[in-house]
């Protein structure tokens, strides 16, 4: 791993007295597989700290995985809150449109994403294999199956990149997605 995906955020929380843990799932595994990783990590953190509950902050697909762990894997009793950041809870119209793009181009773009995920620490990134969950129909089905636990506090935030050049890694995504879906965080 060449750098921390979360940037300076963990240190900011730790400076305020919070203990920070990472689930360690791969970005491109299925929601179900990564939810199992999240569920195991919740158990480990509870055992390690003696805490009754954890607060989860999840980004992008990680929000779907945390919701699945809470709802389908019974971890709601150990979660006080789930905060999702730029999670595609309703899917992406951009991903829906990929069916009109030649497959070799989609695969090429996915391979470029895989390189970025590998640099961030993923062992075997497979963006092409994991993008189906971002289709709006797949997200709607997931939302039908994954019911919020009434004992968990949920909140969700989305962000807007001011200008595409704010993050050169996200620049191409930002421009493309903005044409289809409007302002976005680059993903």
Regions found by a protein language model. Name each.
Residues 1-57, 61-103:
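N-terminal non-catalytic accessory region
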């Amino acid at each position: 791993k060449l750098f921390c995906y979360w940037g300076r955020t963990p240190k900011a929380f730790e400076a305020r007295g919070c203990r920070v843990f990472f689930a360690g799932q791969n970005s491109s595994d299925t929601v179900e597989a990564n939810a199992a990783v999240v569920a195991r990590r919740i158990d480990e953190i509870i055992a390690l700290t003696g805490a009754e509950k954890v607060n989860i902050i999840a980004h992008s697909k990680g929000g779907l995985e945390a919701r699945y762990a809470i709802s389908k894997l019974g971890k709601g009793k150990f979660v006080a809150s789930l905060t999702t950041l730029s999670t595609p809870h309703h899917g992406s119209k951009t991903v829906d449109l990929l069916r009109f793009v030649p497959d070799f181009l989609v695969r090429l773009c996915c391979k470029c994403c895989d390189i970025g995920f590998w640099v961030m620490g993923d062992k075997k990134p497979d963006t092409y294999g994991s993008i189906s969950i971002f289709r709006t129909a797949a997200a709607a089905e997931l939302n039908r199956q994954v019911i919020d636990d009434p004992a968990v506090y949920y909140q969700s935030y989305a962000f807007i990149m001011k200008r595409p050049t704010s993050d050169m890694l996200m620049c191409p995504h930002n421009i493309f997605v903005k044409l289809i879906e409007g302002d976005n965080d680059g993903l």
